[in-house]
Amino acid sequence: MKGATAQIDSQALQHNLAVVRSQIPANTKVVAVVKANAYGHGLVQVAKTLSSADAYAVARLEEALILRSSGIVKPIIMLEGFFSADHMPVLAANNLQTAVHTEEQLQALEQMTLPNPVTVWVKLDTGMHRLGVRPEEGDAFCARLAKCKNIVQPFNFITHFSCADELDNLATAKQIELFNQLTKDYPGQRSLASSAGIMEWHDAHADWIRPGIMLYGASPFEGKTGIDHGLRPVMTVKTNLIAVRVLKQSEPVGYGAKWVSP
């Protein structure tokens, strides 16, 4: 018997990208997030289906190189940055963009000799507290980048929201305000919003937005589905039933007897 199969609807992907574009200003660009094998949907297939996106975002160098080897020529941003100085010549040779947020990354950029400069995004920690340059360290970090011969000037800025899916939480508004304050004196491009921010925090659209799960037809909001937002599910999982059981009322099922027949 054939096992479970996952079917990918390319038209749904393209529809969802159109929904994204309908919610942002015409001059805001779209970075399609295809990390983690495009959320399990197939990295190369999804990237090529979303060919009208302005750029792609991945988490690891290996993902970026797979895209390049498949013929993808549009900008690719490594959201977590690089983790070894040895990666820098590879980034430069493949025209990859990278987040920078640690002292080690900054030192590597300052000390390497690269064949051509790379485009970087300064990841600012505005409240997520997972990755990023702390606000009080931002100007000093940027001053060193401004002198760095290995990066394209001007450099760009990126941050990530911690509570954008909670519309009554003031944290997102505070993050937007802090990000704007930290970057107001710099000329680079800016990116704040992922799926929840795109849908509900319109003052965070800036120069680039980063749709992730909404591209695949899912809602970032509790109690909502993608259909509620006009999105279409991209993946359908199909399999065969191996049995149909008829249970009596109050009979438990499975380990721990957690579920009881009504």
Give residue spans per PLM region.
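A charged N-terminal "starter" segment
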Residues: 1-97, 103, 116, 152-153
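Generic serine detector
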Residues: 10, 22, 51-52, 69-70, ...
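Active-site loop/helix belt of alpha/beta enzymes
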Residues: 36-48, 94, 106-119, 126-251
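Unusually extended, aromatic-enriched hydrophobic runs near protein termini
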Residues: 13, 17, 31, 122, ...
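Short, intrinsically disordered, charge-balanced linker/junction segments flanking boundaries
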Residues: 255-262
